[in-house]
Amino acid sequence: SKKGTVRANHYHPIQEQKVLLIKGQFISIYKDLLKKDSIKITHVVNEGDLIVTKPNVAHTMVFTKDSIFLNLVRGEREHENYGITHTIKHVFVEEEERKMLLENYKLECRCCSSKNLKRVVSLGYQPLANNLLNKKNSKCELYPLEMNLCKECFNCQLSITVNPKKMFSNYLYLSSTSKTFVKHFETAAEKYIKEFKLSHKNSYIIDVGSNDGVALKPFKDKKYKNILGIEPAKNLAKLANKNKIKTFNGFLEMKNIRKIKKNADLILASNVFAHSDNLKEMAECMLKLLKKSGIIVIEVQYLLNTIKDLTFD
């Protein structure tokens, strides 16, 4: 099969099927048709992998490389390929989804570039956060919500990267709606001021992925004048600027560095690295904006505590 093509889009009502990938790579998409609450799941099949498809499991292969595989079906083959006992067509990966998977699927770790990724959990296909519909029959874009673990550097990450412009140009989550978040950033600001000896007259503070300005507001309330948010969502940057929290509307990337004032004493990045597909470029940009004696504070989710404390919904 050639790179970019699709095979299968069917299921076997009786036979079990085994596929041994000799060369290449493909994304396997499957769903158990007998289970009412079954979800559509994806995973990457690499050279040497053997996958077993049980009866009544709809499956499709989207090829990311030119591939050669052995297709083994247990059962009599003296009949047409499509028939009542052997293979029944079930198209559940359309052209639009094929393109989405080929464009957005992550085949290597965002941190160390290893291809040794292990699937931890699949929650099926989901819409973007807070992407609520106005009309009952409206269609919304769905993406696999699945988490992988890199077996080399142990970074946990999603299997899909959504186009950041689609995700953040008009972001639908306001951080200030969470009282817990507001209190957290108020406490954090007090800690940073004391620990890093920040001056409300001279210290320059940047918050990356500043949302509506929730992390910078405590500094503003304490009369810190030299603060800057960096926020790609136009609606949130506009709201923050309206609330007198100076905010640059754009992504933190090399092409935007020249537009942003440098020599920051403190750069904050709270819950923002998990949203980035290019972690190294983001880190390099921060270093270019930081003064030599400056400090970067990065806040990221830690999976063990997330599970232990049930801090998810």
What are these regions (language model features)?
Residues 1-14:
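Conserved short histidine dyad/triad with adjacent acidic residue
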Residues 268:
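A conserved beta-strand element that flanks and buttresses the S-adenosyl-L-methionine
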Residues 14-27, 31-33:
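Glycine- and acidic-residue-biased ligand/ion/polar-headgroup-sensing regions
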